């Protein structure tokens, strides 16, 4: 039971903050998937966003990474978080196989739908661009005020 709770809400969010928790998560992904080059960029202070934003941002990034590993067959992924005065912009860009976005609208892709729903629950915006054989680019912009 403790393991399930830890997976739902890692204690490191409270103890280390969002930036260190994400860095730790990226290190885990990198060690488990050594063929995948993970590039993490954090600009601005993302550690004072509040509990609700923190857990949702953590889950968004986790799901984006999961999608890359399961579906994209990418060799690189760039995750960037940019905190400005009023927003947090998250970008996840991979060089994987990409997909036809019209298929996404016809089927229920739960991972991407979950990311979109989390962004919308925070009054944020979700955008996805994908080209077959060229990769996928997710952009999430969340208001922080």
Regions flagged by a language model, labelled:
Residues 1-145:
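Coiled-coil dimerization/phosphotransfer module
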